[in-house]
Amino acid sequence: MQPLPPTSQEAAIDLGLESFATLADGTRIHIPRCYRKAERALKTAQRRVSRRKTGSNRRRKAVKLLAKAHLKVKRQRQDFHHKVALQLVLLNDTLYHEELQTANMLKNHHLAKSIQDAGWSQFLSILSFKAACAGRSVVAVPPAYTSQTCSGCGVVKKGLSVRWHTCPDCGTSLHRDHNAALNIERLGQRLRGAVA
């Protein structure tokens, strides 16, 4: 990818499980759930491998089919990440995102499969690579309280289970992920200003 002309646009990205990403302008990018859609076929293929005798030709064939099914899911996810990252890089000069510790998040067994299916870590590395090639900047923001802090007045008064943010102090009312994206943008601009 060649360096791109400036667009004077910025985007803050809040990665999530309900929607893959929510931008500061309110745009929501829906998650394709590649693994979840293929899960039944993958389980069937895995069962076939388990039922075959070790070392047999039928088992080798079943293992190849299972690997092919997993590869298809991997490529679908990768294709989605490349398309979203390219779109964001083409439209924006600066991209802000949370500095997520996905390895720690995977310890939560209730969310691990969904987090793996979303592939946030892979997406962020693809985004950083494409941005560097295009001469764009990517700023990672500490994720502490981005979803809980009000983007209007800065008050922290809600738990993570609340999906709709309504501030009791200033009256700001919007989706929690949109609120988080606005906070990420504000923090990113502050960090970028301190570096520049």
Stretch-by-stretch model annotation:
Residues 1-196:
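Positively charged, helix-rich recognition surfaces that bind polyanionic ligands
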